[in-house]
């Protein structure tokens, strides 16, 4: 009898333990984060250090990093992140414990990335304050509006505002921003087809995750269940700039429709998820800081509606706008334009020798670039795979060369039968930005592609840095002494010489004595002017250490050391809060702090 008694005692003990464990278990806290590109998050991990430079935000950085400087991993917070390209055509789900990398992921939605959104510090501070395990379900796509793609079901069909409908009625033939009468049915059909698509994707994904939370969160206790503990909405930019849905000058009532739509959105989300009192945070768009007052007020307005009092909270993100980065950004544009330009041209296409930044870099080698003889030939693609069937702005591509031409860029290639001439080599008229380039020392010829070679002598290599100065309408390959040192696949609208600073791997091919420079390029045409046109000139230039110091000092007038320090906190444009981790970290913390008092 004794073994049976012992077995019964052991079984009873485990039953008591399991019962006690289940009684102590707490429901899984589920938070939903949704919106467009700023909810995705474009803050590069590389901007983390900037957070620590400000005494007010330095404590945030300590929460975000391990002692060794790596991003923290939250042991009690799990992520299900539905995202993908802006059109939703290739969605994927990112899973795992919360860490840095659940921001924007481009076309690899299932892979951990190099960016964060507000979810990182949101989860960190929720984990810090809550005892329960936490699941964050995040759904976000760039470029999606509340008036169309996230349109809630109860808002009804999209209707043109009265002012816009009257404008359309006035111009049946169409006008700027006004479709022709015969195209309007398709416009409306497309609008109806797009309406609510991303709202449904969001709801469907949340329901899918909640059908089996253990798939995402291994610590989920089925007996304890889960609690829909809060929803955070961070969106707005596409509505802010939508002049069709919100017409007229910026004034207090301009964005009333957004307030109406957002109220419907809150009601519908709660209804569709069977969570009538689920706490809801509106992340009020703070792009441009305290500007866009009327839109920000419209966004926050639902929080003041009687039906939402106490469980809908508007969190203004404008206070997190970084004014130091904002001040430096325009200067960075000017700075980048200067350092990426080798030489500017005057209206007639000749060199602008009076340009302030012209004097620091000097041509390398003899004879001087303008005196060098190039040998060149043009060819057309002959194989079907190399021909463009339709217009493409990016025309540059590699084609199959005639037999015997495969190594045309090598120093020992025999180019004696090629045409000779000075550069730039060109054809047609390249006209843009008030500059007309139509006079060329050498004519390109009829072929689309150009192969060109020249030689120059170098006596010494005593420059601090070297660069390629290149004039080209389309893309190009540049070879130095038989080695490819640069490829550019896009195009250049403005006629000017671009500056491409060479690294060690490229400079090592530059030598004392004779050097062979070879270039592969192609021409351009556009739909309005099918005549082909082109221009190409390439030269290697150097800058001495003394001139580099002078240039750096002069450039500080454009972009000061203080500005450069601020820009270390930026990795994207202003519409993405500069891709600044400092801004997104503060937002995530603020969203968590808004929801915490509403937790049961």
Q: How would you describe each model-predicted region?
A:
Residues 1-5:
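Positively charged n-region of N-terminal signal peptides that target proteins for export
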Residues 480-503:
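Solvent-exposed beta-strand/loop surfaces of large extracellular or lumenal domains
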Residues 25-229, 234-366, 410, 457, ...:
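Conserved, well-structured interaction surfaces
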Residues 418, 456-482, 517:
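Aromatic-lined ligand-binding clefts that engage carbohydrates, nucleic acids, or primary amines
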């Amino acid at each position: 009898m004794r073994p049976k008694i012992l077995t019964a005692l052991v079984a009873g003990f485990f039953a008591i333990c399991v019962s006690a464990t289940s009684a102590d278990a707490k429901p899984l806290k589920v938070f939903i984060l949704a919106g467009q590109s700023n909810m995705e998050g474009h803050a590069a991990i590389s901007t983390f250090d900037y957070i620590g430079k400000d005494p007010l935000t330095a404590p945030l950085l300590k929460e975000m990093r391990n002692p060794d400087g790596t991003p923290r991993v939250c042991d009690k917070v799990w992520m299900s992140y539905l995202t993908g390209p802006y059109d939703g055509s290739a969605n994927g789900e990112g899973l795992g414990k919360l860490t840095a990398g659940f921001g924007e992921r481009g076309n690899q939605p299932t892979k951990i990335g190099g960016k964060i959104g507000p979810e990182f510090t949101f989860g960190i501070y929720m984990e810090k304050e809550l005892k329960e395990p936490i699941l964050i379900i995040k759904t976000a796509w760039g470029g999606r509006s509340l008036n169309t793609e996230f349109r809630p079901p109860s808002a009804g069909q999209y209707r043109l505002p009265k002012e816009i409908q009257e404008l359309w009625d006035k111009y049946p033939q169409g006008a700027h921003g006004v479709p022709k009468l015969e195209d309007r049915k398709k416009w409306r059909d497309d609008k109806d087809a797009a309406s609510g698509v991303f709202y449904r994707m969001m709801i469907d994904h949340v329901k899918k995750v909640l059908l089996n939370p253990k798939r995402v969160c291994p610590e989920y206790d089925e007996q304890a269940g889960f609690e829909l503990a809060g929803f955070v909405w961070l969106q707005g930019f596409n509505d802010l700039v939508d002049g069709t849905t919100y017409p007229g000058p910026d004034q207090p009532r301009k964005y009333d429709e957004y307030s109406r739509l957002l109220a419907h959105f809150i009601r519908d989300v709660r209804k569709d998820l069977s969570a009538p009192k689920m706490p809801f945070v509106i992340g009020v768009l703070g792009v441009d800081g305290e500007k866009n007052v009327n839109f920000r007020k419209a966004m926050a307005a639902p929080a003041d509606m009687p039906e939402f009092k106490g469980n809908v909270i508007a969190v203004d993100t404008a206070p997190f706008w970084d004014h130091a980065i904002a001040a430096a950004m325009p200067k960075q544009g000017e700075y980048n334009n200067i350092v990426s330009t080798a030489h500017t041209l005057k209206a007639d296409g000749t060199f602008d020798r009076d340009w302030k930044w012209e004097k620091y870099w000097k041509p390398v080698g003899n004879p001087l670039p303008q005196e060098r003889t190039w040998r060149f030939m043009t060819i057309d693609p002959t194989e079907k795979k190399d021909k463009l069937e339709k217009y493409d702005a990016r025309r540059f591509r590699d084609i199959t060369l005639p037999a015997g031409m495969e190594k045309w860029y090598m120093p020992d290639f025999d180019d004696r039968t090629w045409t000779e001439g000075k550069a730039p080599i060109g054809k047609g008229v390249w006209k843009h930005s008030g500059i007309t380039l139509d006079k060329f020392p050498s004519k390109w010829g009829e072929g689309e592609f150009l192969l060109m070679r020249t030689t120059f002598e170098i006596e010494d290599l005593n420059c601090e840095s070297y660069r390629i100065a290149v004039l080209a309408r389309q893309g190009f390959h540049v070879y130095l002494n038989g080695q490819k040192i640069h490829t550019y696949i896009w195009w250049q609208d403005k006629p000017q010489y671009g500056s491409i600073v060479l690294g060690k791997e490229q400079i090592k091919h530059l030598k004392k004595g004779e050097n062979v420079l070879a270039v592969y390029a192609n021409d351009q045409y556009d739909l309005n002017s099918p005549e082909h046109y082109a221009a190409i000139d390439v030269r290697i230039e150097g800058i001495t250490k003394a001139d580099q110091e002078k240039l750096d000092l002069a450039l500080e007038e454009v972009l000061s050391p203080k500005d450069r320090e601020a820009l270390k906190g930026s990795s994207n444009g202003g519409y993405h809060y500069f891709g600044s981790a400092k801004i997104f970290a503060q937002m995530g913390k603020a969203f968590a702090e808004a929801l915490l008092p509403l937790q049961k």
